C-alpha cells in the first residue's frame, strides 16, 4: 500500500496522466492482493488464538500451510496481472493516452505479485506472535529503498536511465523482493527456526479447513469493498482525467490518515485473539472499545489537519487549478468519512479475531453495494454532483457500517465464536 502511494507522489512530478494511470492500476493490484488475504487473515486469527492457548505445534502447522498456499496463489496472480494487463485496463475504460503508462507499470509490478503474497503471510505470522516491530522495520527500510529507486529510475539520476513510469514499477518490484527476503530471514531467526516434516505428516487438513473457514468470509468482505471501489473508479473515469487524477491524489493522501487506525486495529486484534484463546472475554471486549476510541480520535485529528492543508498539498503536487480546487473540497468531506472508516477498520479486525467472521462479510456486501456503489452512481453521475457527490456516498457507506459494527460488538454475540476449544 505504501509503495503505491510513494510511486504516486513521486510520479506527480513527472506527469498527471501517469498519476491517473498508476492510480487505476493500483486499484486493480490491490484487489488482486486481497486474494492473498484469504490465507493471511486466517493465519493471523488462528495463530493469535493458538498462541493464547499455548499450542505451538498448531502455530507451526498454520504458518507452513499458509506459506505454501500463498506461494501457489501468488504465482497464478502474477501471471494473470502480467499477461492480462492490456485486457484488464481496457475493461476499466482507461483512455488511450493513459494506456501506455498503465500497461507498462502493471506488467512489471504484476509479474512479481508473488513477492507480496509471501511477505504478507510472513508479516501476519510475526504480528500474531507479538513481533509486529519486525514487519514495521522492514516497511521503513523498503520504503526508503523504493524512494531512492524511484528517484533514480524515474528521473534518471545516479547514472541510471530515465524510465519514467516503468522505472517506478521496477523500483517497486525490487523493493517488494527485498522485503520478502528480509521477512523470511526474520521468521527463521526470531520465530520459527524450522518446519519439522513430521508436523505435516499427515497433511494438517484441519488447519487448512480452519484457514479457509476464517479467511474466505474475512477476505470476502475486503474483496467486496475493493471490487466496489474498482467499479466506482470506472464511474470516476467517466467523469474525465481531472476527476480520476484528483481521486488518485486524495486516496493516497488520506491513506496516511487511516494508517494509524490500521496499526491500532491490527495490534488490538492480536491481543483480542490472545485473550479469546485464554477465555478472557470481558477483557477482550474492553480492549476493543479502547482501540475504537483511540482510532477515532487520531483519525479525526489527522483528517482535520489534512483538510486545512489541502490547498497547499495539492498545489505542491500539481499546477492544474481544477484538481487543486476539487481535491481541497473533497478533503473537507473526507473528515467525516474517516470517523466511519476508523470504526470499520477496528470492528472488522476485532470481530475476525474473535472468530466472528461471517457478520462483517454480510454487512459489508449489502451496505457497500447498496450505498457506496448505488448512491455513488446516483449522486456522482445521475444527479451530476461529480466526484464530490461520490465522496458523499462513500461517507454514508463508511458511517452506516460503522454504526452497525459498534452495535454488534456491544451485543457480545461474538463471544462464542472462538476456534480454540
Predicted regions and their residues:
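Residue-level hotspots within pore-lining transmembrane alpha-helices
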Residues: 2-3, 32-36, 76, 80, ...
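Transmembrane alpha-helix boundary and packing residues in multipass membrane permease domains
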Residues: 8-9, 45, 86-87, 124, ...
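Short alpha-helical transmembrane segments in multi-pass integral membrane proteins
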Residues: 47-114, 160-216, 272-337, 379-421
Amino acid at each position: 500500500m505504501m509503495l503505491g502511494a510513494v510511486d504516486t507522489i513521486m510520479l506527480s512530478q513527472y506527469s498527471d496522466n501517469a498519476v491517473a494511470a498508476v492510480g487505476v492500476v493500483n486499484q486493480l493490484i490491490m484487489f488482486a492482493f486481497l486474494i492473498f488475504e484469504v490465507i493471511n487473515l486466517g493465519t493471523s486469527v488462528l495463530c493469535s488464538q493458538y498462541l493464547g492457548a499455548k499450542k505451538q505445534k498448531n502455530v507451526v502447522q498454520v504458518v507452513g500451510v499458509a506459506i505454501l498456499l500463498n506461494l501457489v496463489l501468488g504465482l497464478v496472480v502474477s501471471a494473470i496481472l502480467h499477461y492480462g494487463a492490456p485486457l484488464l485496463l481496457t475493461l476499466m475504460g482507461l483512455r488511450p493516452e493513459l494506456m501506455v503508462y498503465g500497461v507498462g507499470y502493471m506488467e512489471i509490478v504484476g509479474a512479481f505479485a508473488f513477492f507480496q503474497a509471501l511477505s504478507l503471510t510472513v508479516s501476519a505470522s510475526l504480528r500474531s506472535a507479538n513481533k509486529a516491530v519486525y514487519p514495521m522495520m522492514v516497511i521503513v527500510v523498503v520504503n526508503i529503498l523504493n524512494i531512492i529507486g524511484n528517484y533514480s529510475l524515474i528521473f534518471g539520476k545516479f547514472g541510471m536511465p530515465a524510465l519514467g513510469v516503468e522505472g517506478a514499477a521496477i523500483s517497486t518490484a525490487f523493493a517488494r523482493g527485498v522485503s520478502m527476503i528480509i521477512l523470511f530471514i526474520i521468521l527463521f531467526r526470531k520465530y520459527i527456526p524450522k518446519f519439522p516434516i513430521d508436523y505435516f505428516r499427515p497433511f494438517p487438513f484441519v488447519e487448512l479447513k480452519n484457514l479457509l473457514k476464517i479467511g474466505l468470509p474475512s477476505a470476502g468482505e475486503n474483496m467486496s469493498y475493493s471490487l466496489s471501489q474498482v467499479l466506482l473508479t470506472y464511474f470516476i473515469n467517466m467523469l474525465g482525467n481531472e476527476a480520476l487524477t484528483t481521486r488518485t491524489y486524495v486516496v493516497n493522501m488520506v491513506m496516511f490518515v487511516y494508517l494509524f487506525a490500521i496499526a491500532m486495529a491490527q495490534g488490538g486484534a492480536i491481543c483480542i485473539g490472545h485473550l479469546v484463546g485464554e477465555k478472557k472475554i470481558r477483557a477482550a471486549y474492553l480492549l476493543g472499545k479502547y482501540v475504537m476510541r483511540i482510532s477515532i480520535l487520531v483519525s479525526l485529528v489527522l483528517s482535520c489537519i489534512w483538510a486545512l492543508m489541502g490547498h497547499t498539498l495539492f498545489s505542491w503536487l500539481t499546477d492544474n487549478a481544477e484538481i487543486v480546487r476539487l481535491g481541497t473540497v473533497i478533503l473537507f468531506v473526507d473528515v467525516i468519512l474517516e470517523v466511519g472508516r476508523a470504526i470499520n477498520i477496528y470492528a472488522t479486525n476485532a470481530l475476525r479475531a474473535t472468530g466472528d467472521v461471517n457478520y462483517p462479510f454480510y454487512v459489508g456486501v449489502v451496505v457497500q453495494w447498496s450505498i457506496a456503489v448505488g448512491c455513488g452512481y446516483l449522486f456522482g453521475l445521475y444527479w451530476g454532483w461529480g466526484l464530490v457527490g461520490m465522496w458523499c456516498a462513500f461517507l454514508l457507506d463508511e458511517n452506516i457500517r460503522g454504526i452497525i459494527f459498534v452495535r454488534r460488538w456491544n451485543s457480545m454475540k461474538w463471544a462464542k465464536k472462538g476456534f480454540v476449544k
